[in-house]
Amino acid sequence: FRPDVIFVTPSYILAILDEFRAQEVDPRQSSLKIAMCGAEPWTNAMRTEIEDSFDPHAIDNYGLSEIIGPGVSCECIESKDGPHIWEDHFYPEVIDPATGKVLPDGEFGELVFTTLTKEAMPIVRYRPRDLSRLLPGTARSMRRMEKVAGRSDDMMIVRGVNVFPSQIEEIILKDERLAPHFVIELRRAERLDQITVVVESRLDAES
């Protein structure tokens, strides 16, 4: 197989790049023409490394598992200036995360999506807690969303998986040897995110 397109998290395509180099294979021999990257934050520096090494177009793709997964919005290879939202299927809004007030296009706030064509499980004004703003269309007529700047809650995205501190706390509380006091250390090692949880032990805990 010689695929033209790969759909992947940016950290994994960089890990693939490292494997090419480890095996002394020129990544430019790959058949890839487009790398659709999403499910975790990535930077313009990461895009540049992907494009300079593999020689494909690296474009940003945004999705929500609660709505459709990947494909709520996608960058165009012509402009690469932010994902265009598929407004035929999703109605986007940006609100003030504190008050819920709808903000005009161009102002930063929390994204809100309503599905327009989903039949089995329509979703109305879903708040994914992602912070961005709506911008005019460029290469496509549909509006763009700026790259997500952060979140209005404390969720972490690790290798494309949503991780909440409350989930970690739930596991800790099941162990009677551990106190409910912990620190989460999130770092990137060799392209991939890693989590270390430092937990206090109870004074009366048996080793």
Which residues are covered by each model-predicted region?
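Active-site glycine/GP-rich loop and adjacent strand/helix microenvironment
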Residues: 1-207
